[in-house]
């Protein structure tokens, strides 16, 4: 086994001032939200303005900060330059779709075309996340945040979210190319995309504008100077398996990733004879140690940050601020200063 010589913290991410988009994700239940909120807090200390966005339908950042957020950015209590928002997964979905049961008065060709168009839009994987993503990016583009942190949904949803710019770029390009053949349907397309009742030419112009924005976003997501993905896992088989799958998919999509957080690690206490006091803790520690060794072998070119399992949950700005220091100060069980990080 090769020893991981890279710094075991997220300091490299915090120091990379060119980053605009930072995704934090992994398997469900590994502590993604705590990690993403902690990262946003650390970034707020060195960047002009930081926005953290929840794309997880569970919307845990409200619980993490003990403050209610909604679909517009709100200042996080206790911070001058940290903002948060939670987007709804069903934005722009059912209400804007055509009712397939309604008879068309414009003839069979137009009716058939509408059904085909609806199937094209409705058949996109993760259409609810896609519409949410589209509206969210329009909002963010109109603002001036220095860096944006995404607290993402579990792996499958996140991969669809990241595929959306490429997918929609291809779809919009094809729709624009079909303008001459399907001009009567362009107005219908405008309604589906929330562009309002506008003419076919206006719809095409709006689609071109949207396509330009999507192309810029797609390009930025594939630029390692602007975008990176921080993977969060725990030292168990299923989580490690899903992390490897996630990293392979990110690599396939040309999205940079070089940081892994291993969360909820157990550091059992020993008695005066050097024996672990709790047998179950000792067994769990042995399992985690095995997977930590595998992580060190598999990801020797990654910065691997190890975070402890605490006795109580991390909730509220104060506890999150204290916990966030673990991202830049490697955890040391024997250090008295570490114990102070969890105090109010």
UniProtKB/Swiss-Prot annotation:
Binding annotation for ATP: 27-34, 236, 263
Alphabetical list of Gene3D superfamilies matching this protein: P-loop containing nucleotide triphosphate hydrolases (3.40.50.300)
Keywords of the record: ATP-binding, Cytoplasm, Endoplasmic reticulum, Hydrolase, Metal-binding, Nucleotide-binding, Transport, Zinc
Intracellular or extracellular location(s): Cytoplasm; Endoplasmic reticulum
InterPro entries per record: Anion-transp_ATPase-like_dom, ATPase_ArsA/GET3, ATPase_ArsA/GET3_euk, P-loop_NTPase
EC number assigned by the record: 3.6.-.-
List of catalytic residues: 56
Pfam family, one: ArsA_ATPase
GO BP: detoxification of arsenic-containing substance; positive regulation of insulin secretion; tail-anchored membrane protein insertion into ER membrane
Molecular function via GO: ATP binding; ATP hydrolysis activity; metal ion binding
Binding-site residues, Zn(2+): 278, 281
GO cellular component: axon; GET complex; neuronal cell body
Record keyword Aminoacyl-tRNA synthetase present: no
Function, as annotated: ATPase required for the post-translational delivery of tail-anchored (TA) proteins to the endoplasmic reticulum. Recognizes and selectively binds the transmembrane domain of TA proteins in the cytosol. This complex then targets to the endoplasmic reticulum by membrane-bound receptors, where the tail-anchored protein is released for insertion. This process is regulated by ATP binding and hydrolysis. ATP binding drives the homodimer towards the closed dimer state, facilitating recognition of newly synthesized TA membrane proteins. ATP hydrolysis is required for insertion.
HAMAP family in the record: Asna1_Get3 (MF_03112)
Quaternary structure annotation from Swiss-Prot or TrEMBL: Homodimer.
Family: Belongs to the arsA ATPase family.
Name of this protein: ATPase ASNA1 homolog
Organism in which the protein naturally occurs: Brugia malayi (Filarial nematode worm)
Upper classification of the organism: Eukaryota, Metazoa, Ecdysozoa, Nematoda, Chromadorea
